[in-house]
C-alpha cells in the first residue's frame, strides 16, 4: 500500500490528476496499444476531473488513445437523466477532452438482461488485457463502487441492491428525496477492481475517516469492502487531513516519512 497523507481536498485532486497524467504519458499510448483507465462518479473526483481538464487544455496530456471503463450505473434510470452516471461523466469530463466516443465504456442500466450486460462488460475489459489504473472513491461505510458492506471480496460485475445508507447519501443528487434514488445499480465487483494493475482511491472529508482507518489499519473484512485493497500489489490511497482523523498519529507519521518531501513533486498546492 502507498498512502499519501495531504492537507486539503484541492491537494488531493491535483495530486491524483498529475498521477493519472504521468501514468498516461509514461505509457505512451497508441491506437493499437491504448492506456486503459477506470473512472468513478460522485462528489470526490469532481475536482480531479476539473484539474485533468485544465491540464488537457494546457497541452499536458491527450486522451485520444485512452480507453475508459466506469465503475457503475443506476438501473432503470435513463441515460439522458441529469443524475445518470452517463450524464455525469459527459458533463463533467468527457465533453471537455479529446477522448474518442468509441473508447468510452459505461454500464447500461436499461437493458432487458442485466446479467448479460454485466458479462459483456467483463469481457470487454478482458479484451484490453487489463485496466492499467482504476481511480475510485470510497463510501462512508467503506464501500467501493456499489460493492456495499458484506459484498463478496471476489465478486465480478453484477446487479446490486443499494443500502439505505447509500440511498440517503445519494439523495442529495435527487432533491434530497430518497424515494427518487434508484434502488439498484450495476457495478464492477471487488474482484474486478483487484484485477486492475493499479488502484487509486481518493478520500476527502471527516465523514470518510472511518473508511480510511479500515483501509489502512483494519483487517480485511467484507463489511468494509475497501479493506480488500490491502491485498492489491499497487494500492494507492490519497487523503486530505480531515479523512485522516481516525488514524493513529504514528501511522500518518510513518507514511509521511515514506513519501519524503511530497510537496512540490506530485501535486500542486493551489
Curated annotation (Swiss-Prot):
SUPFAM superfamilies: NagB/RpiA/CoA transferase-like
Gene Ontology BP annotations: carbohydrate metabolic process; glucosamine catabolic process; N-acetylglucosamine catabolic process; N-acetylneuraminate catabolic process
Enzyme class: hydrolase
Catalytic activity: alpha-D-glucosamine 6-phosphate + H2O = beta-D-fructose 6-phosphate + NH4(+)
Active-site residues from the entry: 72, 141, 143, 148
GO cellular component, one term: cytoplasm
Activity modulation: Allosterically activated by N-acetylglucosamine 6-phosphate (GlcNAc6P).
Annotated site residues (Part of the allosteric site) in this chain: 151, 158, 160-161, 254
Pathway membership, UniProt: Amino-sugar metabolism; N-acetylneuraminate degradation; D-fructose 6-phosphate from N-acetylneuraminate: step 5/5
Enzyme Commission designation: 3.5.99.6
Alphabetical keyword list: Allosteric enzyme, Carbohydrate metabolism, Hydrolase
One annotated GO molecular function: identical protein binding
NCBIfam families: nagB (TIGR00502)
Subunit structure: Homohexamer.
Protein function: Catalyzes the reversible isomerization-deamination of glucosamine 6-phosphate (GlcN6P) to form fructose 6-phosphate (Fru6P) and ammonium ion.
Family in the record: Belongs to the glucosamine/galactosamine-6-phosphate isomerase family. NagB subfamily.
Protein name: Glucosamine-6-phosphate deaminase
Organism field: Haemophilus influenzae (strain ATCC 51907 / DSM 11121 / KW20 / Rd)
Amino acid at each position: 500500500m502507498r498512502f499519501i497523507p495531504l492537507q486539503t481536498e484541492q491537494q488531493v485532486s491535483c495530486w491524483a490528476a498529475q498521477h493519472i497524467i504521468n501514468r498516461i504519458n509514461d505509457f505512451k499510448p497508441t491506437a493499437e496499444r491504448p492506456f486503459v483507465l477506470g473512472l468513478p462518479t460522485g462528489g470526490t473526483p469532481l475536482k480531479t476531473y476539473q484539474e485533468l481538464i485544465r491540464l488537457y487544455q494546457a497541452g499536458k496530456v491527450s486522451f485520444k488513445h485512452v480507453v475508459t471503463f466506469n465503475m457503475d450505473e443506476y438501473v432503470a434510470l435513463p441515460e439522458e437523466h441529469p443524475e445518470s452516471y452517463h450524464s455525469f461523466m459527459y458533463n463533467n469530463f468527457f465533453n471537455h477532452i479529446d477522448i474518442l466516443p468509441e473508447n468510452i465504456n459505461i454500464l447500461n442500466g436499461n437493458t432487458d438482461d442485466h446479467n448479460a450486460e454485466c458479462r459483456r462488460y467483463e469481457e470487454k475489459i478482458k479484451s484490453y488485457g487489463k485496466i492499467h489504473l482504476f481511480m475510485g472513491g470510497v463510501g462512508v461505510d467503506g464501500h467501493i463502487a456499489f460493492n456495499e458492506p458484506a459484498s463478496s471480496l471476489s465478486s465480478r460485475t453484477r446487479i446490486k441492491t443499494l443500502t439505505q445508507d447509500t440511498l440517503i447519501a445519494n439523495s442529495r443528487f435527487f432533491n434530497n428525496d430518497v424515494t427518487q434514488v434508484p434502488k439498484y445499480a450495476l457495478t464492477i465487483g471487488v474482484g474486478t477492481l483487484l484485477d486492475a494493475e493499479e488502484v487509486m482511491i481518493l478520500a476527502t472529508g471527516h465523514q470518510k475517516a472511518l473508511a480510511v482507518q479500515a483501509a489502512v489499519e483494519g483487517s480485511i473484512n467484507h463489511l468494509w469492502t475497501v479493506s480488500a485493497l490491502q491485498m492489491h500489489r499497487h494500492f494507492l490511497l490519497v487523503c486530505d487531513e480531515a479523512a485522516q482523523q481516525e488514524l493513529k498519529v504514528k501511522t500518518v507519521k510513518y507514511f509521511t516519512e515514506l513519501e519524503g518531501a511530497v510537496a512540490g513533486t506530485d501535486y500542486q498546492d493551489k
